[in-house]
A protein has these predicted regions:
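Structural alpha/beta surface segment adjacent to cysteine/selenocysteine redox centers
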Residues: 103, 113-184, 253-258
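Sec-dependent bacterial lipoprotein signal peptides
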Residues: 1-15
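ABC transporter ATPase nucleotide-binding domain signature
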Residues: 187
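Solvent-exposed, acidic/flexible segments
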Residues: 76, 94-98, 102, 108-115, ...
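Extracytoplasmic thiol/disulfide redox context detector
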Residues: 8-9, 17-139, 261-262
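C-terminal cap of thioredoxin/glutaredoxin-like
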Residues: 5, 19-44, 49, 190-262
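Structured loop/turn residues at beta-strand edges in well-structured enzyme cores
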Residues: 12, 128, 223
Length: 262
């Protein structure tokens, strides 16, 4: 299936997850398109009574429309409506010669799961000057556990095989993977022995990356996922952009503008 097909299909199901609520115990209907445009909120039924309260992000630099600065996008997209500009520009994890496009996500978010096929199709055709990174959100205990799982899989060289599988296990198999023991068993199905998993999961390297993701999430003022941050400067999502197809068009314009300024 091509990128355009993925984009059209995903638009019908995509909104965003806010506050770190875990997936519902039973599969809920996708949000309607008007819910997406209304403000990127998760339907009430998607938040079970046992949902863990979200953590309030620490104060961070506010997003600014900077009306006195020429918009780097075409007339189709407006700063303050389709994307916001962070002021000052925030750090990235990519080399200076690259334009970083970061996807802020959570494995427990059904909308992140829905967007993932489109993200992968876009990665396959992105410009060479774009560096794509995934950054897990860290706004609750469950989200932090999933962030540690992401960086553990990355450190073990398993993220390529396990990224999709983590989404499927949580959403299709209804296994939240919210404890170290559950994750250890799951990693075992990918040939990772218990000792290797534990030493990596509890390592200083993984802890440092989780802390860095937490810091950047606060700096980027991430309030919902999936969120896209272009070069530490521009923040958008599918709801703001007007849909999934528009989201990737906007990412392309913002990235091209940043590249031309290097």
């Amino acid at each position: 299936m091509g990128l355009r097909s993925f984009l059209i299909l995903t638009t019908l199901a995509l909104a965003s997850c806010g506050g770190g609520s875990p997936p519902a115990a039973t599969k809920s209907a996708p949000p309607a398109p008007e819910d997406i445009a209304a403000g990127n909120t998760v339907p009430d039924e998607a938040e079970p009574p046992s949902a863990e309260p979200s953590e309030t992000p620490a104060p961070a630099p506010a997003a600014s429309n900077e009306a006195n600065v020429a918009a780097p996008t075409s007339a189709h997209f407006q700063v303050g409506k389709n994307y916001t500009r962070l002021s000052p520009t925030q750090p990235t994890s990519s080399s200076p010669d690259k334009v970083e496009v970061a996807e802020i996500f959570w494995y427990g978010c059904p909308h992140c799961y829905a967007l993932d096929p489109s993200v992968k199709s876009w990665i396959a055709s992105k410009p060479e000057y774009v560096s794509f990174v995934r950054m897990p959100v860290v706004w609750s205990d469950v989200a932090k556990t999933h962030a540690r799982a992401f960086y553990t899989a990355e450190a073990l060289g398993k993220i390529g095989a396990m990224h999709d599988a983590l989404f499927r296990e949580i959403h299709d198999n209804r296994n939240l993977l919210d404890t170290e023991d559950k994750l250890a068993a799951f990693f075992g199905t990918f040939g990772v022995d218990l000792a290797s998993f534990q030493s990596t999961y509890e390592s200083a390297g993984v802890q440092t990356k989780v802390q860095r993701a937490d810091e950047l999430g606060r700096r980027y003022r991430v309030a919902s996922v999936p969120t896209i941050v272009v070069n530490g400067k521009y923040v958008t999502d599918a709801g703001m952009a007007g849909g999934v197809e528009q989201l990737f068009a906007l990412i392309g314009e913002l990235a091209a503008s940043e590249h031309s300024g290097k």
